[in-house]
């Protein structure tokens, strides 16, 4: 059964207690803030929403990220930053007895989190580690990867922080943590038993748990919303974990990708940016003729094409997304050539 975009009768910041925000492409791009993000987050917090920031980055300390966000005018405590190192170390600690020997292949942040969770870091396979945990580490050498492979071959349980194959850098796209993990997998024939990062939902689950450590009640899933710019990480993690989600257009995802998204990558809501946290969300409605309407905009599928009345508005995109998803799930072969081109006006 096709799952379509939903609506709310009150602003998202009031409809949900907890927002699980991605960072790059949502709050900032590299070193620069995303327009409207900080003001929108402050307004959401004033409305009673708790904010946690989730990132697959395993090398940056929480306080470093928090300081960057404070530089944008946000009031952020380090505990609100949920990195894949934080989640991975907790994941290993739950799987192994206290004090278990762990070989760490990763940055200092990952090593600190492993120690913080009561595990014992060992130097290499000669120390017979019970687990290996691998994160992104730009200073990784062949010998480090070989030692990880030797330990995994000897029976150590293999955990990873995330499986992102690439990472953007100023000069272009570079190998990410997942590319380095593939080297160990290829050498050993062993897949990691678990990954802490998105698109797994484990990060969102742990973020809700970590919120309780600050004296808050556990926020149920239905009162939590995952927010991100990437369908294949942020939104897929939400779908895997049964979280509602909001996809914003301030990062990598564009209107065409939204219309062509397969079922496991489809968000609950879409928005141009985080200002929509302060707005009720209109729900597209299908009439008897098969036309999808979202307030004054409409979209329909006819003769192999998705058509839209207004290719400049978010409501037009909302209607077109629903028309495209319905057509695709009924067997239509959609592509960039069969969906409308949008130019969303700010």
How does the language model describe each region?
Residues 84-86:
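Polytopic endomembrane small-metabolite transporters, centered on the Drug/Metabolite Transporter
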Residues 2-21, 28-31, 42-46, 66-79, ...:
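Asp-based, Mg2+/Mn2+-dependent phosphohydrolase catalytic module
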Residues 50:
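Conserved phosphate-binding loops in N-terminal lobes of ATP-dependent enzymes
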Residues 57:
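Conserved phosphate/oxyanion-binding catalytic-loop motifs
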